[in-house]
Structures are given as structure tokens and as C-alpha cells.
From Swiss-Prot:
<feature type="region of interest" description="Disordered">
    <location>
        <begin position="1"/>
        <end position="22"/>
    </location>
</feature>
<feature type="binding site">
    <location>
        <begin position="138"/>
        <end position="143"/>
    </location>
    <ligand>
        <name>ATP</name>
    </ligand>
</feature>
<protein>
    <recommendedName>
        <fullName>mRNA cleavage and polyadenylation factor CLP1</fullName>
    </recommendedName>
</protein>
<dbReference type="InterPro" id="IPR038239">
    <property type="entry name" value="Clp1_N_sf"/>
</dbReference>
<dbReference type="GO" id="GO:0005849">
    <property type="term" value="C:mRNA cleavage factor complex"/>
</dbReference>
<comment type="similarity">
    <text>Belongs to the Clp1 family. Clp1 subfamily.</text>
</comment>
<keyword id="KW-0539">Nucleus</keyword>
<dbReference type="InterPro" id="IPR027417">
    <property type="entry name" value="P-loop_NTPase"/>
</dbReference>
<dbReference type="Pfam" id="PF06807">
    <property type="entry name" value="Clp1"/>
</dbReference>
<dbReference type="InterPro" id="IPR032324">
    <property type="entry name" value="Clp1_N"/>
</dbReference>
<dbReference type="InterPro" id="IPR010655">
    <property type="entry name" value="Clp1_C"/>
</dbReference>
<dbReference type="GO" id="GO:0006388">
    <property type="term" value="P:tRNA splicing, via endonucleolytic cleavage and ligation"/>
</dbReference>
<keyword id="KW-0547">Nucleotide-binding</keyword>
<dbReference type="GO" id="GO:0005524">
    <property type="term" value="F:ATP binding"/>
</dbReference>
<feature type="binding site">
    <location>
        <position position="35"/>
    </location>
    <ligand>
        <name>ATP</name>
    </ligand>
</feature>
<keyword id="KW-0507">mRNA processing</keyword>
<dbReference type="InterPro" id="IPR045116">
    <property type="entry name" value="Clp1/Grc3"/>
</dbReference>
Length: 468
């Protein structure tokens, strides 16, 4: 990976990536309707090549005789008709499973296709399926969303995918909400694919819309519901301008935290359903959640009906310990600045004065105290107490190793405008010199740092060692 001359700005991972991998390979035969499940650490590389037959990785078909490399991945290769794989490298664990959720996924896909066909038949007067996937942590929500997106793209649909889980990013860093239209396959090695900042790619890059949340859980702070409202407005407006995407609808991935509920009340789920006009609500891995939501959305007006569907949690879902999740978040941040695999990037190091940065730090608090389910008939962002959303901060040593979201707002804009503004990009604070009142920054591209409002959150956590 390249360094910037004289600055030693190569990424410094917590554990060595691309560690020596065994050159010994083995062949794995898979019978029809089985899948090869594996877990590989960030310090090792697993390679998989399809020798014969057909197979898919979260819905995306593997190309024959093409080697795919995986690091820090927990995944599964499924085959409908049987295949032969060539496997190399070291894994933490792997096995072949005969019981898989893929038939249920296929049935769900065909049900969504019927709704898309209805949208086409109506001349796009009706929107396609508006899907929200909910469930506890580690229940396979993101995997299901990937499969549904891949299957839709393979049938020439262009669904919109929305990520409302701040614990892991989609085409952005953790701590953000993002949305993107998918008209091509989902990348196998890079997860959701790449954005224009990631450099050249054999798969068309995605153009995500990003809002910065900056907190770990939806229950924190005062910005979750306003940002959901803003994202819903942006997505539905975009679909009205794009007939193909409107027919395909959208799929929303959510945080497991919103599925915990309080006494059978799921405020954040209800808010998402209301703002996005969700009509298909998929529950994973929780009988109680399914029962509560079925009761909530039973006997509604047909024009506002919400179909609650229960899917079983896949046996391939594993608990991801906090150590793994932290390594995953740091890897996503490194990839944002330095690229992925062979597609390396050369970020720019810049030094600026304290006065050049207009930083607004999120004030954490009890969001639930502000928005109880019975307070308002409908949520209104104008009811938020704006004075306590952000506090203006001056650079200090505590800012080192943190990320700043550069918004499209001006620093003189009101706090609600700053909150609702999309993100232009992120910069990394490499060093703060209080004596000279200088800040050294790492930026994805050269040029002057914009004078826009910058948002500082508490999530993701600081990433030490990103630069030397």
C-alpha cells in the first residue's frame, strides 16, 4: 500500500493484514441446496474459486475460474444446483450446512416481485414494495438485505437500499445513514460495493446519499428521528423522479437496538414505518417482536396496510464480538481513506489553522424523553429543542484520531439545517498542535478544506494509528 512521501501516511492496522497465507488449496464439493459457511479473521486471507457448477455469495453469483479474497469476513457460499470450489488460506472455522434459509429468501423475492409487477402495471402510479427488515443483533438482517438486493438487480430491477444502522456503514463509514440505488450486482469482496471516492472498480460505483448520525445507538441523542424523516423525504423524492427505482421500491436495513422495544412499544420502528410508508415489515429471529408488530399493524386501512412477515434466523448467523466489530469499523475507516485490496488510494495530508474549522459536536442526551409515542399525533422535527443538538467546539488534543463529517451546510446556518444536511465527505484529525494552533488533517482529496459546518460525533470511536 502506498505512502505519501515524507509523511508516512500508510494505514497502520491493529493487526497485520495480508499475513502470509498458506498456498495449499483444497477442493470442496457442494451438493444442491447446501452452503459453505466460513469465518476468517482480519489477519488472514481466504480465497475461493468456483471450478464448476454455479454458486452465489449473498445472492451475487460467483464468476467461474475467478479467485475471490476475503479478510475479516463471516459469510456463506450457497449453490442451488451443486458446485465445486477451490479453497485456499486459513479460516477460524468453516463447515458445510444442509439446512439453509435460501428457499425462504427466494419465496420472499418472488413475493416482492409481484408487488413490483403491480407497480409496473399501474404505470408507476403505485410505488413498489417498501420493505423494512428488523430483528435483534446478529440475526442476519444485513445478509438478508444483500440477498434481496442482489436478486432484484439480477431481474433487471433498480431497488433503493437504505442503511439506518450506525454500527456499520454502507458505502460510507460507521456512524452514518446512507441510501443508494442498485442497478448492478452487489460486489462480493467489498460488501456493498464502492463509491466514487474508492477509485476505479470493475463494478459500476454507487452514488450514495449520506447523513451523519454520529452516535452508537438510535436511542441516544436527539437526531435519529429527524434524520429518519429527512432520509425518507430524500428517498421518496428520488423515487418520484426515477420510474425504474419507484417500481423496484426500497429495502431498509436497521439497527438491532430498535427491536428491543419498551413494554411492547417500538417507537423507532413505528417512526420508520410511518415516515417511509413501509408496507412490508420483515422480522428476523424474534417471535416476540413478530407478535408485537403483528398486533400493532393488524386491521389497518387497506390503503395503509403493513404486511408483517416472520423469517427464521439462519443457522449461519453468528454472534460478532465487540472486538470483531471494532476491527470491522476501523477497517471501513481505513478503506475510506486508503482503498481496498489492489485499489489503493493516496489521501492528502493538510495543515490548517484552528479558525479554519467550524466544528459542531453532538450533545448526547435522552432522545426518548423528547419523543414519547403519545406526545404527538405525528412526528414533527420542528418540535425538537434545537439549542441542545450541537455545541460549537475549538480544536484540542482530545480531537486527535477522530473523524469530522463535512456537511453541505454553512457554519452560520441554524442547527436544524446543519443536522439535516447531507455529508460531502469525511476528514481525519491526525494531530493537534495547541501551541501553534494548527491541525493536521487527512483528506480523501487534495485542495483546501471546505469552510462548511463539520459535525463531530462519538461514533465511530477514535481510530488511532491511521497515520504515522
Amino acid at each position: 500500500m502506498l505512502s505519501l512521501p515524507g509523511l508516512n501516511l500508510a494505514p497502520q492496522p491493529a493487526e497485520p493484514l495480508n499475513a502470509p497465507t498458506s498456498t495449499v488449496t483444497r477442493t470442496q464439493d457442494l451438493a444442491a441446496n447446501t452452503e459453505y459457511r466460513f469465518e476468517v479473521s482480519f489477519a488472514r486471507t481466504l480465497t475461493i474459486k468456483l471450478q464448476s457448477g454455479t454458486a452465489e455469495f449473498f445472492g451475487t453469483e460467483l464468476a467461474p475460474s475467478t479467485t475471490y479474497s476475503f479478510q475479516g469476513t463471516k459469510g456463506a457460499v450457497f449453490t442451488w444446483h451443486g458446485c465445486k470450489l477451490e479453497i485456499g488460506g486459513e479460516v477460524e472455522s468453516d463447515y458445510v450446512a444442509e439446512e439453509t434459509p435460501m428457499m425462504s429468501c427466494a419465496n420472499l423475492h418472488f413475493a416482492l416481485e409481484l408487488l413490483r409487477d403491480q407497480s409496473v402495471s399501474s404505470g408507476s402510479a403505485e410505488m413498489g414494495p417498501r420493505v423494512l427488515v428488523v430483528g435483534p443483533e446478529h440475526s442476519g438482517k444485513t445478509s438478508l438485505v444483500k440477498v434481496m438486493t442482489s436478486y432484484a438487480a439480477k431481474t433487471s430491477r433498480q431497488p433503493m437500499v437504505v442503511n439506518l444502522d450506525p454500527r456499520q456503514g454502507m458505502l460510507s463509514i460507521p456512524g452514518s445513514f446512507s441510501a443508494a440505488a442498485y442497478s448492478s450486482i452487489v460486489d462480493i469482496e467489498e460488501g456493498w460495493g464502492s463509491s466514487p471516492i474508492s477509485g476505479p472498480s470493475p463494478i459500476p460505483v454507487k452514488m450514495p446519499l449520506v447523513y451523519h448520525y454520529g452516535l452508537k445507538d438510535p436511542e441516544e441523542g436527539k437526531v435519529f428521528k429527524p434524520l429518519v424523516t429527512r432520509m425518507a423525504l430524500a428517498v421518496t423524492s428520488r423515487l418520484e423522479e426515477d420510474k425504474l427505482s419507484k417500481q423496484a421500491g426500497f429495502i431498509i436495513d436497521s439497527s438491532g437496538a430498535i427491536s428491543q422495544g419498551r413494554n411492547g412499544v417500538y417507537e423507532n420502528i413505528e417512526h420508520i414505518v410511518s415516515e417511509f410508508s413501509v408496507n412490508v415489515l420483515i422480522t428476523l429471529g424474534s417471535e416476540r417482536l413478530y407478535s408485537d408488530l403483528s398486533r400493532k399493524y393488524r386491521n389497518r386501512d387497506p390503503s395503509e396496510s403493513v404486511n408483517v412477515i416472520r423469517l427464521d434466523k439462519s443457522g449461519g448467523c453468528v454472534n460478532r464480538p465487540e472486538e470483531y466489530m471494532k476491527a470491522l469499523r476501523h477497517a471501513q475507516v481505513r478503506e475510506y481513506f486508503f482503498g481496498h485490496g489492489d485499489n489503493t488510494l493516496a489521501p492528502s495530508s493538510q495543515t490548517c489553522d484552528f479558525g479554519d474549522l467550524h466544528i459542531f459536536q453532538i450533545v448526547e442526551g435522552d432522545e426518548g424523553a423528547l419523543y414519547r409515542s403519545g406526545d404527538y399525533d405525528e412526528y414533527d422535527p420542528s418540535n425538537v429543542s434545537l439549542a441542545s443538538i450541537y455545541t460549537r467546539v475549538t480544536p484540542s488534543p482530545s480531537l486527535q484520531n477522530s473523524l469530522l463529517a463535512i456537511t453541505t451546510a454553512s457554519p452560520t446556518d441554524s442547527q436544524d439545517v446543519i443536522r439535516d444536511s447531507s455529508v460531502k465527505g469525511y476528514i481525519y484529525v491526525a494531530d493537534v498542535d495547541e501551541a501553534k494552533k494548527k491541525v493536521r488533517l487527512l483528506s480523501p482529496q487534495p485542495g483546501m478544506i471546505p469552510g462548511n459546518a463539520m459535525v463531530l460525533g462519538t461514533w465511530p470511536e477514535d481510530v488511532p494509528g491511521l497515520v504515522g
